Design a protein with these regions (language model features):
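N-terminal membrane-anchoring alpha-helices
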Residues: 1-50, 288, 293-297
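Catalytic core of membrane glycerolipid acyltransferases/transacylases, capturing the structured
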Residues: 12, 16-37, 63-130
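A short, well-structured juxtamembrane/interface segment
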Residues: 43-67
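Short His-Asn-centered micro-motif
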Residues: 57, 70-73, 97-100, 158-160, ...
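A cross-family acyltransferase "interaction/gating" segment
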Residues: 102-122, 149-244
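Surface-exposed cleft-lining segments at the edges of enzyme active sites
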Residues: 123-135, 174-177
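A Trp-anchored, charged/polar loop motif used as the substrate-binding/catalytic surface
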Residues: 133-146
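Accessory terminal regions of nucleic-acid processing enzymes
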Residues: 243-297
Length: 297
């Protein structure tokens, strides 16, 4: 609360002058405050709730580079987990926000001040009425990313677009047992705008043993005792990742979707193997158990 208030209070200072150096200075100050907030949350994880972290793949990372982080999205706990895990390891994580969030009092100002890239999506009905808008969301996302060039940066993208739950899993007719279908739009924009500057793509797989989708209450009240995270470092043009030439081609969407589907197949096998080794319940059993106990948070 205090950190959020400080960021909001500093927004007028950032807006005072249009000079790039001035605004960059205040952005760095606000990111420092955001980093302090993450440090406090991480301390709560480690000291108060004594959560056991099982993390693999955190090596040869740099605070002064640019990274794209991809992750499965299981719960509201995912963001504090990723922020805490990467704190002081890579730059402060930013993520795409919906344009509507900018109009939320105080929150919108803070998100703008932290230079969160804004995404505006059009519904199928809107595109049917206005076919000229097709592709505009991708172009806007690409331009938002271009404004973040030439600075240390981490962009976090939950590729599934939403948190998993039984109804969404069923509605999508997902081919995966533990995941929703990956969406390529946001990744496409990032790779086109920043692909030549990215140090690495970090493919993150989060697993909560005993839970498919834990709530914040499970964390706060100590029911979430263990968190497993696998980080796979990838480079453009290697490890099956499309090359810069493919990313900038007319067939970029096809190449990126194919690659993401391959990554999600690997992620599915990784989760399945880990849960089998731990003797965990099947996906459907865990979801049915959690659906019977609503999360108050």
């Amino acid at each position: 609360m205090i950190c959020g208030t400080l960021v909001t209070v500093m927004v007028p200072l950032k807006m005072l002058f249009p000079w790039r150096k001035w605004r960059n200075f205040w952005t760095k100050v606000m990111l420092g405050i955001g980093s302090l907030f993450i440090w406090i949350n991480k301390g709560i994880f480690l000291l108060v709730h004594r959560v056991v972290w099982e993390i693999s793949g955190l090596k040869k990372l740099d605070l002064n580079r640019q990274y794209l982080v991809l992750s499965n999205h299981q719960s509201s706990v995912d963001i504090p987990v990723i922020q805490g895990m990467f704190h002081k390891v890579i730059p402060f994580p930013r993520f795409f926000i919906k344009q509507q969030l900018l109009w939320v009092p105080f929150l919108g100002l803070a998100l703008w001040a932290l230079d969160m890239p804004v995404m505006k999506r059009y519904s199928k009905s809107k595109l049917k009425k206005r076919p000229d808008l097709r592709g505009k969301d991708l172009e806007r996302s690409r331009k938002a990313c271009e404004q973040l060039r030439d600075q240390p940066l981490t962009l976090l993208n939950f590729v599934e677009g939403t948190r998993i739950d039984p109804s969404k899993h069923s509605d999508q007719n997902s081919p995966f047992q533990y995941l929703l279908r990956p969406k390529s739009g946001g990744i496409h924009a990032v790779l086109q705008a920043l692909g030549d500057q990215l140090e690495a793509i970090l493919d993150v797989t989060i697993i909560y043993p005993g839970f498919q989708s834990p709530g914040l209450s499970d964390l706060v009240f100590g029911r979430l005792r263990r968190i497993r995270v696998d980080v796979d470092q990838l480079c453009i043009g290697e490890d099956g990742v499309p090359t810069l030439e493919q990313i900038r081609s007319r067939e970029a969407g096809v190449h990126i979707r194919k690659w993401l589907n391959e990554r999600w197949q690997r992620k599915e096998q990784l989760i399945k193997q880990y849960l089998e080794e731990q003797g965990e319940q099947e996906f459907s059993e865990i979801m049915e158990t959690q659906a019977a106990v609503p999360d108050p948070v």
